[in-house]
Amino acid sequence: MPHQQILMLFGLLPVATNISTWWNFGSMLLACSTLQVMTGFFLAVHYTANINMAFSSIVHIIRDVPYGWLMQNLHAIGASMFFICIYIHIARGLYYGSYLNKETWLSGTTLLIMLMATAFFGYVLPWGQMSFWAATVITNLLTAIPYLGSTMTTWLWGGFAINDPTLTRFFALHFILPFGIISLSSLHIMLLHEDGSSNPLGTNSDIDKIPFHPYQTYKDLLMLTMMTTLLLMIVSFFPDIFNDPDNFSKANPLVTPQHIKPEWYFLFAYGILRSIPNKLGGALALTMSIMILLTVPFTHTSKLRSMMFRPFMQLMFWTFAATFLVITWTATKPVEPPFTTISQVAALMYFMFFISNPIMGWMENKIMKT
């Protein structure tokens, strides 16, 4: 395609002049997605979805396959980067009121659910000790569903316990779901460009827009370069920083790890699950911790879109961010006091942010009227 046509293609995307660095994470997510699909394909070529050979095949990839160690580490750490970017992307959407583009927000939340499912299936594939037990604990939550639970669990496992059929179907799902993510990402981007992205002020930016290229492309490239540098530094110097020590041992159904936990990016949801001493209640809280994002566009009552001029909401937002980190931290700790109490308080505060959002908006409107 000639240079002028490329310019015209990007020039057709007018964007607000005042969008900040927080708007760069969408393109970074696209880059992460591309990296995951490419490295995932080369890993799938050498991987064996069999409970007796899965762990050995990962060892084979790292030791014997040319640049296999690089592919495996890029894929594993790339997943962590993906989640760091998506959590910042969601936080920016909550802070600046991007959720008022309802279709874009709802498609994005669906993308998050698909991404979490894909990452969970991927975590099981190495068939290490923590992979096996995390899969056992999480899939067992289906049994909490009245009437259908046991049947659904047996169907998902492919038997009466996690075994070879479970690993095979998890591999199949881990392979196929990214294609759904790519399709939904395309829809997400199309829906975004229907109305155009918001800006930090939360105002209509139609009167003050600039072409996407060259301004935003270079801005995006800077952040992409920084992310790539960080990724390569971690891959080169700290490749096992996000790994669980238990996962370096092959899965053993007869030995339970002292403390079962999923990957770090699920710990906030796992912490909420553990904070409720009831199986069904915990499973519902776990589901609601993600699903509650779907309610945000419909509970916005403030006349201001962005939190930039809403000091009370800013305080609540940063309390929410701190709560997210606290739940993540408590989920890494044993189920004993004071961690159980801390996680219960933090879980309550997590949900209180979404509940008090409309009340705070209504109060702000009252204050502005007086």
Swiss-Prot record:
Pfam families: Cytochrom_B_C, Cytochrome_B. Heme b b566 binds at residues 89, 188. Its cofactor is heme b. The keyword Membrane applies. PANTHER family: CYTOCHROME B (PTHR19271:SF16). Heme 1 (or BL or b562) is low-potential and absorbs at about 562 nm, and heme 2 (or BH or b566) is high-potential and absorbs at about 566 nm. This is Cytochrome b. The lineage of its organism: Eukaryota, Metazoa, Chordata, Craniata, Vertebrata.
